[in-house]
A protein has these predicted regions:
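Histidine-acidic metal/acid-base catalytic patches
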Residues: 8-20, 24, 34-178
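Helix-loop segments that flank and shape redox-cofactor active sites
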Residues: 31
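Active-site-proximal, glycine-rich beta->alpha crossover segments in alpha/beta enzymes
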Residues: 1-8
Length: 178
């Protein structure tokens, strides 16, 4: 509770500057969405994000909506969370994960069929709520014998970006009946 109150204090203190210069704050959720080593977690569910957004009720106070972080808890309904935070999502990390056990998951390719998350439904919710911020594929697996920083494979992130752009284009065309 102390950590949450300190965050609220900080956000309230900086909101006048954010208002003056049109700066959006986008807090990243806790990753994973459960306590680790006894450390407190304050942004890990719909209830947590709504509590924070309501306590600092300013359009510049928003979220980085990370599907991997929120999605690490299978009880989180990501589509519902996107609709609940409509207008307050300033940045999106969109990646797929595959549940492998209780509180266990691994990063998967972006296609819905390769993981446990419905990537189309997530992108559609962002589209339908008028999201117009940056979207990135977040982490990437190391594929095709790539040697790079673990978690940031260039090839997989490029494939993810192309996949997400394809979904966004289809949503655009569907909305215009093209």
């Amino acid at each position: 509770e102390t950590l949450f109150e300190n965050l609220v204090y900080f956000l309230n203190a900086i909101m006048p500057v954010c208002d003056k210069y049109d700066i959006n704050m986008a807090i990243h959720p806790d990753d994973p969405a459960w306590p680790v080593f006894g450390l407190p977690r304050i942004v890990r569910s719909k209830e947590h994000i709504m509590r924070l957004l309501n306590r600092v009720d300013n359009p510049h106070n928003g979220l980085t909506f990370c599907t991997g972080s929120f999605g690490s808890n299978p009880d989180n309904d990501l589509v519902d969370m996107i609709y609940a935070a409509k207008g307050r999502i300033h940045f999106a990390h969109v990646r797929n994960i595959k549940y492998t056990g209780d509180r266990q998951f691994e990063e998967a390719a972006h296609l819905s069929s390769d993981g446990s998350l419905d990537m189309y439904a997530i992108m559609k919710a962002l589209y339908d709520t008028g999201f117009d911020g940056p979207i990135r594929p977040d982490h990437g697996r190391m594929i095709w014998d790539e040697k790079a920083m673990p978690g940031y494979g260039l090839y997989d992130r490029a494939l993810g970006a192309a996949y997400l752009n394809g979904i966004w284009e289809s949503l655009n065309k569907e909305s215009r009946n093209i």
